[in-house]
Each structure stands twice: as C-alpha cells, then as structure tokens.
C-alpha cells in the first residue's frame, strides 16, 4: 500500500493551554494506524508544558520531550529552532524510562538547537519580566537573545552534555520521504505570538504553524499536494486562559468560581490561571493566520459546557445530551468563526469525538429537538 508524506502541525488558537498535547497524540496515533513512519516533533523551549495521558492512565506534563514518547514506534525529534534546558530534558527522560518507555535510542536532537544555559534562567529571574509581563522566567527569551547576538552555544558546541540523552543529528535530511508523517506540537497559542497584536504581553517568538515548521526545519511546499498532505490543527477551548499576574488583556475575564469550574494551574509554574469568556475574534485571527484552507479545528474541553460528554468517544453521545446542555454547546459552536472546520471535540484529558462541523450541528439539533418533543 502506497502511503504519502504527511505534515501535521498542532497550534493553539488562543493564549495557550488548549489541550495541544492530547490533540498531538491523537494525530500521531491516527498516522501510525495509517501505516506511516511517524516523527513526533517538539520545537521552541521549556516554558510550556504539554500534557498527555498514557494507556495506563498516567498524566505526563512534558516541557522538552515530544509527547509521542508514549507511542513506542514513534521517532522523537527536537528541532533546530528549539532551546534545550539539558537538566529538564534529562529529568524527563529519566522519569519516562523509569516508567518503562525507551526513548534514548529513538530521540534525535538537532545539532543546531540552542543550549539553554543556567545563566539564561538567572538573567530572567533577576529581571522584572515576571512582574511586568507574567513571564515564566525559564530562560527562553534570554537564550534567544544570545542566539541573535551569536553568543549562544548550540548543542553541537557542547555534544558531551547531550550525547547520552539521544542522537545528536538530523534524523531526516530529506524529510519528505514517502510514508513519513511529521507531527509538530506547537507551543503557546496564537495570541501569545510576538507579532499577534498583544505585545509586550506575549512570548518571544511567533506561534503559527509556519513558524513551528521553520523551527522544525521542514516546509509544506515540499509536499506533493499541500492541500491534501498538510494539515494545521487549531485547538481552542470554551474559556481561554492566560497565565497569572500582569499577563495582558483577556476578553470577558471572569473567575473559575463564576464558571462553576475547578481552578486550573499553569503546567510549569503551578500558578492559578486567569480565565475569560470565549472570544471569536482571536480564534478567527488564528484560523486565517494559520492558512484557513489547510486548517481543521479541535474544540477541546467540550465537557466543561456539556458535562454529560465527559469521557465520551462516540458521536451518538452528542445526540443523547439533555436539551439544556445541547443548547449551551450549540451556542458555543455557533460562535466559532468557521464552524464547518471542526473535526474533533475534546471530552476529557484523554478522550475525544471525531466528527465534522456539519455533523456536530445535526447531532446538537437532534438533542434539542428531543427535548422539544418531550415538552409537547
């Protein structure tokens, strides 16, 4: 069976923490089931944690290691546009190997990746970044500044520090071989991009699919059919968040108590997140900034507005919703700028339902109609 090259990029459509880790793992598993050789790619730095739940139900929050480590046949790759804190990467490898995952023989670290050194973290912690902008102060901005000044050290400059963690080389100089699938887990969210309109309350890079492709060293223009082989998953959530503190404007800011939800904490700093109302404008910007025609939307955490969907995996369960919950979810879906691009709704930390936007409307309408019949 002939299997074409695929390139999938998972991006955040708001301000981060939209469940990109789970969606990335979903895509990896789909490509593996189609017979691809899958490259699970992590880019950028350790200021963002990506959460996945493995088959044993264990929750992993990874800052450096690609989330595909839970799939033993996936090739793991940290791209050239990454900043690597060696201590973080080593601790993650030790933790997952203690749980039975073998990663060193299948982890490739690009020699051009930037070595994030302890002094980068110290520089940010001694600055006013956290107070002024809500920064996590993990050294990424300082490392990138050194890279721009050409004073940063690359992995290839300090190979002895990394050679026992993985293979220091590009796993695929010709990346678009038939049968290969690259799944890139982007970091942050579109609204945190350096040029997305929220400066200075932003991260130190842009956060679109094309930016993450550059960080990974790949390009969709090398694919045989860009509209068929390239897919950007824009992940959004009902109530977007921003990190704690003075981290910038958040439309319709509210509280976890008012929403009736348990307060969330940031993956890296463990501070309580700020939370807001769904804002169609930032999602619309994210869709078009990421290519529109190649975009598919994953609506995460649908169970927060329709609790009966918690753990659901079948589309039929949407039609079985109580009318009140179906109406709330339908109202949310209608706010999404291009709802027909929806291909998935998340129903929990490790569960989701695959469907199309049209199917979702039909299922929700069926649930609402059932309630109307009962009223009659």
Predicted regions and their residues:
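Non-transmembrane, aqueous-exposed alpha-helical and coiled segments at domain scale
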Residues: 1-376
């Amino acid at each position: 069976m002939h299997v074409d090259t695929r390139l999938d990029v998972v991006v955040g459509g708001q301000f981060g923490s939209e469940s990109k880790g789970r969606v990335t793992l979903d895509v990896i598993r789909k490509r593996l089931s189609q017979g691809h050789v899958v490259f699970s790619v992590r880019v950028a730095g350790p200021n963002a944690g990506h959460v996945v739940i493995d088959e044993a139900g264990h929750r992993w929050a990874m800052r450096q290691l690609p989330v595909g480590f839970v799939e033993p046949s996936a090739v793991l790759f940290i791209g050239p546009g990454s900043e690597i804190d060696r201590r973080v990467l080593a601790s993650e490898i030790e933790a997952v190997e203690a749980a039975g995952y073998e990663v060193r023989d299948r982890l490739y670290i690009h020699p051009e990746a930037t070595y994030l050194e302890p002094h980068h973290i110290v520089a940010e912690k001694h600055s006013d970044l956290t107070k002024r902008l809500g920064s996590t102060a993990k050294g990424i901005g300082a490392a990138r500044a050194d890279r721009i000044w050409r004073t940063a050290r690359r992995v290839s400059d300090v190979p002895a520090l990394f050679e026992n963690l993985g293979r220091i080389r590009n796993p695929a100089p010709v990346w678009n071989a038939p049968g290969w699938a690259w799944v890139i887990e982007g970091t942050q969210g579109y609204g945190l991009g350096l040029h997305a309109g929220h400066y200075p309350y932003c991260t130190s890079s842009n956060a679109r699919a094309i930016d993450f492709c550059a960080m990974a060293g790949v390009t969709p223009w090398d694919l045989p059919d860009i509209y068929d082989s390239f897919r950007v998953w824009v992940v959004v959530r009902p109530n977007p968040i921003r990190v704690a503190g003075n981290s910038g404007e958040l439309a319709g800011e509210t509280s976890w108590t008012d929403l009736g939800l348990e307060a969330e904490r940031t993956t890296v700093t463990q501070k309580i997140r700020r939370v807001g109302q769904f804002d169609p404008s930032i999602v619309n910007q994210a869709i078009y900034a990421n290519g529109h025609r190649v975009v598919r939307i994953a609506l995460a955490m649908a169970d927060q507005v329709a609790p009966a969907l918690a753990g659901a995996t079948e589309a039929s369960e949407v039609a079985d919703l109580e009318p009140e919950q179906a109406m709330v979810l339908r109202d949310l879906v209608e706010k999404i700028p291009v709802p027909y691009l929806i291909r998935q709704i998340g129903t929990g930390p490790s569960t989701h339902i695959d469907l199309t936007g049209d199917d979702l409307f039909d299922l929700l309408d069926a649930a609402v109609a059932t309630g109307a019949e009962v009223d009659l």
